[in-house]
Amino acid sequence: MSDRKYPLERVRNIGIIAHIDAGKTTTTERILYLTKRTHKIGNIDEGTTVMDWMEQEKARGITITSAATSAYWNGHHLNIIDTPGHVDFTAEVERSLRVLDGGVVVFDGVAGVEAQSETVWRQASRYGVPRICFINKMDRTGANYERTLGMIAERLKAKYLPLQIPIGCAETFRGNCDLLDFKCYGMDNSPEEPVETFDLPAAEKERAVKFRNMMIERLAEEDDEVMEAYLAGEELPIEKLKAAIRRVCLANKAIPIFCGTSLRNKGVKRLLDAVCDYLPSPLDIPAMKGTDPKTGESIERHTSDTEPFSALAFKIVSDPFVGRLVYFRIYSGSISAGSGAYNSTRGERERIGRLIRMHANDREEIEYADAGEIVASLGLRNTFTGDTLCDQNAPILLENIKFPEPVINLAIEPKTRSDQDKMTEGLQKLAEEDPTFKVKFDDETGQTVIYGMGELHLDVLVSRLLSEFKVNAGVGKPRVAYREAITAHAKAQGKFVRQSGGRGQYGDVTIEIEPRERGAGYEFVDNVKGGAIPRNFLMAAESGIRDTLETGVYAGYPMVDVKVIATDGSYHDVDSNENAFKMAGSMAIKAAVAKAKPILLEPIMKLEAVTPEEYMGDVIGDLNSRRGQIISVEPSPETTVITGTVPLAESFGYTTDLRSVTKGRATFSMEFESYREMPGELATQVVEAAGKK
């Protein structure tokens, strides 16, 4: 245990999260400047941001990986993670939220709540992360505070608690009014200077009182102390109101709302104050639940330096200068550089080499780290995303991080033998870093196939492979990751018999198969009676069944959501072996699937397009031509928001086509929604194409 510079109650582990282009990275850059972590303000358009440090991020002006940094404000230690807003990089948000205590959700004051805002909100709700909201870009034409509040209530089903209102809007935006004391704040100025203040304009007094009354009423609905004072007609002092706001925020009963413009330096200092005032410290979060890897019993760890060490690895980065960096969140105990740790996920001892506190891609070496901290380490060779690190004498296995399955793939071929070696190494490192990036080698075609969450996702990873690992490779066109399923019950026998002199081969298994609900996955049931098949042979048959389902039966795509019941079989004392039963299992499942009315499932994407009203008809027409289904059309003051679904197979090239249809004036976001049955005629074309390979 070490002497802390900042007590645990003054530590904040927070994420800056939002839709792409809402201003997350700009907000983070202002925070770094105001907390004196940087001496000049980074600019996305100039590619000078601290947090977007990868070449692909600077070139594209978007955040791809979750960059971590530490900052200090008003006697508090802040660990800040800036997460990507593009849906293809949702995994980065997922793993960040798993280890954070609180979130700052940034909204674009013009666009309001956008598609990825909803996705991120759902992710944060799933992990129970308390949040505060910052309505950004209040200086932009079309910014509307009240409309954004309405969208937070309607689209996110969240109870908002306005703690500020904007004074002015668009070009007249002066700053904001604090509804606790009616003080008004303008420019943040430099780190050393106080925030500019001004008097509440007389014309805004009535509006400010209305919003304050709303805030008190909403607070009273969720907090007993405020309700008592409210019913008694008493005015609570500001400190008691702030304590009540903190209580409802930590309980996720209501969301404090702030506003400003990060780009114009208004509202960020007060936002930092709010992070310290209302978001949780590691002491405020519930004890981490886990299991004893030896007994399977439920155990927990409280946030304390005196409890046994436990941590969750949430990110792997291949640093070109120092090697393999593993980021982890310490939930209990402490760890020193050079000490040992136990990876309970893999049952292996690991050595903590150097301990590092990260500032985007800059490294600060430290001697030790305590409960509640987010740090990185060099030297962990066999630790991967989602693994638990702990004290071997008091082991615990924490809940892993769940990631979505990839929906798109493409083939990649190295130009030379030396490129093959570099490509293999590069793909392995990229797959270690990104759990939604998968690599498979196709034995039949001899191709390496990579899988990801979308076109941009694979584009960025291929760019990194070519530039960081100096690989010269040919890249194929993106392809859809279809799935196979069955729609009927069927029964079949698989009998593998070989006799060619000497000892033969004999395996015989009978199975029944039936469809399961979407997302239920694969299930195997042993209903073999009277020892007709010995246990080890049945397991071999099941292995053959599973392998065949994974490679596909109908069109060469993985088969999902199927229940397999082994009902009968036979074996030979001399000729039966596990390999023969593996072949029999494969034969049985192929025969059964052929009778079970197989279908193809295709990934369906949820799409949100924002377009000027005059192009609305063209955008809808284009979506209809792609087998799209329109869910809603919502007009707003300057644009129309079209929400719908479209098959992934029909979405390739949509960026270019939308730009063409709207003369570059529309934007869109797309995310995976579900797998659905593919229309028969189109499915037949895919099956026939697969048969010609």
UniProtKB/Swiss-Prot annotation:
Residues 9-283 form the tr-type G domain. Transmembrane segments: none annotated. Its main location: cytoplasm. One of its GO terms (molecular function) is GTP binding. GO terms for cellular component: cytoplasm. Keywords: Cytoplasm, Elongation factor, GTP-binding, Nucleotide-binding, Protein biosynthesis. It is found in: Cytoplasm. SUPFAM superfamilies: EF-G C-terminal domain-like (SSF54980), P-loop containing nucleoside triphosphate hydrolases (SSF52540), Ribosomal protein S5 domain 2-like (SSF54211), Translation proteins (SSF50447). GO terms for biological process: ribosome disassembly. InterPro entries: EF-G-like_DII, EFG_II, EFG_III, EFG_III/V, EFG_IV, EFG_V, EFG_V-like, G_TR_CS. Belongs to the TRAFAC class translation factor GTPase superfamily. Classic translation factor GTPase family. EF-G/EF-2 subfamily. NCBIfam families: EF-G, PRK12740.1-5, small_GTP. Catalyzes the GTP-dependent ribosomal translocation step during translation elongation. During this step, the ribosome changes from the pre-translocational (PRE) to the post-translocational (POST) state as the newly formed A-site-bound peptidyl-tRNA and P-site-bound deacylated tRNA move to the P and E sites, respectively. Catalyzes the coordinated movement of the two tRNA molecules, the mRNA and conformational changes in the ribosome. This is Elongation factor G. It comes from Dehalococcoides mccartyi (strain ATCC BAA-2100 / JCM 16839 / KCTC 5957 / BAV1). The gene is fusA.
